[in-house]
Regions:
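Bacterial N-terminal signal peptides
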Residues: 1-8
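Carbohydrate-active catalytic/glycan-binding domains of CAZyme proteins
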Residues: 13-145
């Protein structure tokens, strides 16, 4: 069951203009592994903030072979209360893993249909130094509202 839920609206419906020309780059750095990728945004109605779900790529882990930094990743969560000007780290999605051992979650997408929230995400068992692995899409749902 997906432990985190939200409601989507437009990020561009802002009270004040956001000067993208002078925005910090990057807009968010994951404090755990540094390299967030594959973001998707959802509006959290209870907390009145945007939540970003992303691949928590292990960019700052030393001595990994080849592309191993993109394996072993969880779904990270960051949030903003001011339409993306400042982000803070929330944690990781508490997703049950389809298999035991350290696995990989890539490129989450979260959406709502009626009263149910869904996450679809790529799952790969294990950590690999080269591109490959037995990739599959896994599907999580939740009826909990936050």
């Amino acid at each position: 069951m997906l432990a985190v839920l939200f409601y989507g609206t437009s990020l561009f419906a802002q009270d004040k203009p956001f000067d993208i020309e002078h925005a910090p780059a990057p807009l968010f750095r994951c404090p755990i592994y540094d390299g967030p990728t594959d973001p998707t945004l959802e509006w959290n109605t209870e907390r009145q903030e945007w939540w970003m779900f992303y691949t928590q790529r292990r960019a700052n882990v030393p001595n990994l072979q080849e592309v191993a930094c993109v394996y072993g990743s969880k779904v990270g969560i960051a949030a903003t209360k001011n339409n993306g000007k400042n982000w803070y780290y929330v944690g990781t999605a508490n997703l049950p893993e389809p298999m035991q051992g350290q696995s990989t979650f890539w490129a989450p997408d979260v959406f709502k249909h009626k009263d149910t929230y869904y996450m679809i995400v790529t799952f790969i068992p294990g950590i690999h130094p080269f591109w490959g692995g037995d990739a599959r899409l896994v599907f999580y749902l939740s009826l909990i509202h936050i």
